[in-house]
């Protein structure tokens, strides 16, 4: 049972492409986006429009509150069950998204990583408070450079987890994943074929800049302000990972008085470009993908 996956860096057009293909083939779309799953994050997560949601059956859009954690492991389990249920109904399904851990968990089941160790996590958290995230990130770059390239240094929950795994196991996340990928896969009725949109970097950056401007015109500032007012305490203590997201963090800093609005918008564009680079690194190093130009006859690959 082959399941097509459409991925690519943010703003590459994968959502619009998946939607068009779903309309042409009668498929349902399973979103592999770790932010679109949350109801409160709409404009900043570039969700499909209301019209698109009416036209095609989407899964994992607006299904959780930001106070409800939804891990990559939980996504992989539930997504697998839904794919099988969709197939049982005789329908096609397309997986579309660019969230690294969601994709990897679904397509290449995770290596067995150890549970959190409270004592090691406490020690690392103290080091984070004393030394700062930059020094811990440099430590990870020395120990596991491939994993470090896929991380946003400002999102310390994944940084701490990566260092914690090294301390617990004596092995890096990259080593553990490589060991897993070298083992025989358990029998499964699902086979994923992953296509990635290959877009020139200059064009991608132009699209990122244009999309940021469109988001601001659509009301991203108001959306971020509503989140700021409702979750100010959680934002300040970084207890809601869903809000540690490009597009919102920069506007939260604007509300703190640290930047002008124009500076915040420029930072959103810059940080989104950085995020796209990390996505590309992940896709090239951790996924088996078929890169295809955006102007490819994609329909032929999904109807054959």
UniProtKB/Swiss-Prot annotation:
Site note Interaction with substrate tRNA applies to 99, 121
Example of a GO biological process term: tRNA modification
Q: What is its EC number?
A: 2.5.1.75
Q: Does the keyword Transferase apply?
A: yes
Q: Which GO terms describe its molecular function?
A: ATP binding; tRNA dimethylallyltransferase activity
* Quaternary structure, from the entry: Monomer.
This chain's function reads: Catalyzes the transfer of a dimethylallyl group onto the adenine at position 37 in tRNAs that read codons beginning with uridine, leading to the formation of N6-(dimethylallyl)adenosine (i(6)A).
Q: What is this protein called?
A: tRNA dimethylallyltransferase
What organism is recorded for this protein?
A: Chlorobium luteolum (strain DSM 273 / BCRC 81028 / 2530) (Pelodictyon luteolum)
């Amino acid at each position: 049972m082959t399941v097509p996956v459409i991925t690519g860096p943010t703003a590459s057009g994968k959502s619009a492409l998946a939607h068009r293909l779903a309309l042409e083939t009668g498929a349902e779309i399973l979103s592999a986006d770790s932010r679109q799953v949350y109801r409160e994050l709409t404009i900043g997560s570039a969700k499909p429009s209301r019209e698109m949601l009416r036209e095609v059956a989407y899964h994992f859009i607006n299904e959780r509150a930001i106070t409800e954690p939804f891990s990559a492991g939980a996504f992989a389990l539930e997504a697998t069950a839904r794919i099988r249920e969709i197939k049982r109904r005789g329908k096609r399904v397309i997986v579309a998204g660019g969230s690294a851990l969601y994709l990897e968990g679904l397509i290449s089941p995770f290596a067995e990583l150890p549970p959190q160790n409270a004592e090691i996590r406490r020690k690392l958290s103290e080091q984070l408070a004393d030394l700062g995230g930059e020094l811990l990130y440099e430590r990870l770059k020395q120990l596991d450079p491939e994993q470090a390239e896929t991380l946003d240094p400002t999102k310390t929950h994944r940084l701490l987890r990566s260092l914690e795994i090294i301390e617990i196991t004596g092995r890096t996340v990259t080593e553990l994943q490589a060991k897993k990928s070298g083992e025989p896969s358990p029998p499964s009725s699902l086979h994923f074929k992953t296509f990635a949109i290959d877009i020139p970097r200059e064009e991608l950056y132009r699209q990122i800049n244009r999309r940021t401007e469109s988001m601001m015109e659509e009301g991203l500032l108001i959306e971020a302000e509503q989140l700021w007012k409702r979750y100010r305490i959680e934002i300040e203590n970084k207890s809601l990972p869903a809000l540690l997201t490009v597009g919102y963090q920069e506007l939260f800093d604007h509300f703190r008085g640290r930047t002008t609005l124009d500076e915040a918008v420029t930072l959103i564009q810059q940080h989104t470009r950085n995020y796209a680079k990390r996505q590309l690194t992940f896709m090239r190093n951790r996924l088996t993908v078929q890169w295809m130009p955006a102007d490819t006859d994609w329909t032929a690959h999904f109807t054959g």
